[in-house]
């Protein structure tokens, strides 16, 4: 198996100048309504649960 079997959106990074390295998260805040990572980011419960009800 080689890397051409799957498209995983991988990029090559050079150790000399870190070319090709860039953040993939473009949101200013991960604590937005509907954010699936809200609980992991310790957001307020109302935001972290995305309006879902448990019970």
From Swiss-Prot:
User: Which positions carry the signal peptide feature in this UniProt record?
Assistant: none
Q: Which InterPro entries match?
A: Lantibiotic_typ-A_Bacillales (IPR006079)
Carrying 2,3-didehydrobutyrine, the residues are: 26, 42
Modification 2,3-didehydroalanine (Ser) occurs at:
29
List residues of cross-link (Lanthionine (Ser-Cys)).
Answer: 27-31
Compartments annotated for it: namely: Secreted
Q: Which UniProt keywords apply?
A: Antibiotic, Antimicrobial, Bacteriocin, Lantibiotic, Secreted, Thioether bond
Propeptide residues according to the Swiss-Prot or TrEMBL record: 1-24
Chief subcellular location = secreted
Q: Where is this cross-link: Beta-methyllanthionine (Thr-Cys)?
A: 32-35, 37-43, 47-50, 49-52
Modifications the protein undergoes after translation, according to the UniProt entry: Maturation of lantibiotics involves the enzymatic conversion of Thr, and Ser into dehydrated AA and the formation of thioether bonds with cysteine. This is followed by membrane translocation and cleavage of the modified precursor.
Give any Gene Ontology cellular component. Answer: extracellular region
Which Pfam families does the UniProt record give? Gallidermin (PF02052)
Q: Which family does it belong to?
A: Belongs to the type A lantibiotic family.
Protein purpose: Lanthionine-containing peptide antibiotic (lantibiotic) active on Gram-positive bacteria. The bactericidal activity of lantibiotics is based on depolarization of energized bacterial cytoplasmic membranes, initiated by the formation of aqueous transmembrane pores.
The record's listing under NCBIfam families reads: lantibio_gallid
Q: What name does the UniProt record give this protein?
A: Lantibiotic nisin-U
Q: Name the source organism.
A: Streptococcus uberis
- Which gene produces this protein? nsuA
